[in-house]
Amino acid sequence: MGHHRSCKNGLWKPIGVTISYLAVPFNVSFRARSFFVPNSRKMTTIRRFCCNDLLRFTSVNLDHLTETFNMSFYMTYLARWPDYFHVAEGPGNRIMGYIMGKVEGQGESWHGHVTAVTVSPEYRRQQLAKKLMNLLEDISDKIDKAYFVDLFVRASNTPAIKMYEKLGYVIYRRVLRYYSGEEDGLDMRKALSRDVEKKSIIPLKRPVTPDELEYD
């Protein structure tokens, strides 16, 4: 897998990337996506997360339901899966939200994973989370040829669960005591085009423990 990218002043330059998985090359040009948010004339840009953003996105993580990690964790994702780490940026270079994920697994378990997706409270209800999720799904589906995308969510986080269901995700299984505080997690999945028979989203009939997870 070859990545040729440039980060200057916190902005990604449009680049050409050649990615090869399963011995199949794909030539893709990754460029920032700009759009007007609903009911607003302000331009929003979704671009790759850059090293400089690590010092600027703290305010987005203030929501108590947002899982946060140490700096080395974010650095690992930025280094290993840069194509799955994007930020939504508004006027004045203000970070509105971000998504962080990866691709992993083998055989029919080859999948994209959403590790974290969050939008700052003042920018919610503008479909930013949907746009970030769609971008990760497109990369998983069209570039990495994954079978599905999955994510974990707290069983008590009803608003997030409903949002994911609207985006086409289903509850695949319950993971007992997955989160701190002994709270259960829900493993939600969305089948991609490669999973023609939708085998990846057939729900399990029993809950599992974190030790039984193949990937997390």
Language model region names:
Residues 81, 108, 157, 179-184:
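Short acidic/glycine-enriched loop/turn segments that link adjacent beta-strands
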Residues 44, 51-124, 133-144, 191-193, ...:
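Acetyl-CoA-dependent GNAT
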Residues 116, 120-134, 143, 148, ...:
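Conserved glycine-rich acetyl-CoA-binding loop
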Residues 17, 23-24, 28, 32, ...:
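Acidic, Ala/Val/Gly-enriched low-complexity intrinsically disordered segments
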Residues 150-152, 165-187, 214:
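Conserved catalytic-core motifs of GNAT/GCN5-like acyltransferases
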Residues 3-4, 21:
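Intrinsic-disorder-associated, low-complexity terminal segments enriched in Asp/Asn/His/Tyr and depleted
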